[in-house]
């Protein structure tokens, strides 16, 4: 699914709701849900769909563990080939106004599985990130240049470009439906370009890297080193931004 409204409600809500119904019919006692940390500030349709199912699961009577990971390594792998080819690393604004604590597939899978046996993770919403400090897009680029032995080159994309595109495409989309879909994708892009994938402190109204739980052993920079060494970049699919 791409995150557009139709896909979101079919997959993030309806498919999950049917899976929950089947689980209850089969006598399943514990439902572990892979959600996303971005639902803590829901501005997009797919986030509302995810939240709707989270609430349905909580009310189901089953033991639940709702896991909200920060960011996936493969989502942050898209510019390795650009940098290897001598192209600049693309950033929104100065590349320092957002940050994340990404988690590897292996570490996340281990955390999900352990929810079944760890009673402290039962009937809880569990934000989770990977090990180490939060990393900005600028720091991701700087590390790649260092790893590849290249002079750092960044190209800034104006942060206001995406909401402008979304507004234009949304207006024209009332006449040409396919452009309405592109408008939603622009809104999604702007969200991830302007919001950190960290725990949101509702009282202080800011993201808190220190309060974002960490788990596992593999860092994003470990993965960068492995991918560059093996010349193997993960397939991103709908995780692609650049």
In which residue ranges do the predicted regions lie?
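A hydrophobic C-terminal alpha-helical subdomain
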Residues: 160-242
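A short, hydrophobic beta-strand element of the alpha/beta-hydrolase
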Residues: 33-34, 66
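NAD(P)H-binding glycine-rich loop region in Rossmannoid oxidoreductase-like domains
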Residues: 1-25, 38-40
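Short acidic/polar active-site loop segments enriched in Thr and Asp
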Residues: 29-30
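Oxidoreductase cofactor-interface core, primarily capturing Rossmann-like NAD(P)-dependent enzymes
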Residues: 26, 39-152, 164-170
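A general structural signal for well-ordered alpha-helical segments in protein cores
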Residues: 16, 137, 185-189
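Short, amphipathic alpha-helical "lid/cap" segments that border enzyme active or binding sites
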Residues: 20, 105-113, 217, 221-225
